[in-house]
């Protein structure tokens, strides 16, 4: 592939160890979750499933929550319909917008307004100035 960086195949993901994922920048806990999910799931089937089915399968896996499912939906499955719910910057944004500590459900509601573009909206909103302000409601 002439030096191009291509996504790993399902087989390559299943064969990778958590330590290899840590070397790529994942936190150890997320690396363990990814390695376990890669071994438990039929990744090719996941790619071919409707996004709602794929997300439901992901969320049934141990240690996979809405943030991880959003990352997989966006970058692994190429779907823009599911945002990165619960992301720290989105939590800060919601906290500053609402004037109270935000919940994961608040980030879900924020992204729901963007419909089929919630995934792209989540990436954009992570860079909103209020997402980086730490002087928010306690």
Model region roles, listed by residue range:
Residues 1-138:
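HhH-family (HhH-GPD) DNA N-glycosylase catalytic core used in base-excision repair
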């Amino acid at each position: 592939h002439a030096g191009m960086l291509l996504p790993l195949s399902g087989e390559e993901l299943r064969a990778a160890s958590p330590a290899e994922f840590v070397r790529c920048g994942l936190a150890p806990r997320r690396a363990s979750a990814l390695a376990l999910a890669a071994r438990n799931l039929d990744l090719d089937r996941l790619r071919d499933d409707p996004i709602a089915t794929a997300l439901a399968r992901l969320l049934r896996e141990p240690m996979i929550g809405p943030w991880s499912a959003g990352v997989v939906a966006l970058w692994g499955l190429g779907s823009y319909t599911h945002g990165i719910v619960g992301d720290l910057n989105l939590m800060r944004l919601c906290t500053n917008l609402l004037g109270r500590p935000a919940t994961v459900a608040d980030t879900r509601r924020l992204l729901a307004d963007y419909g089929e573009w919630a995934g792209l909206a989540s990436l954009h909103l992570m860079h909103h100035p209020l997402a980086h302000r730490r002087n928010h409601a306690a």
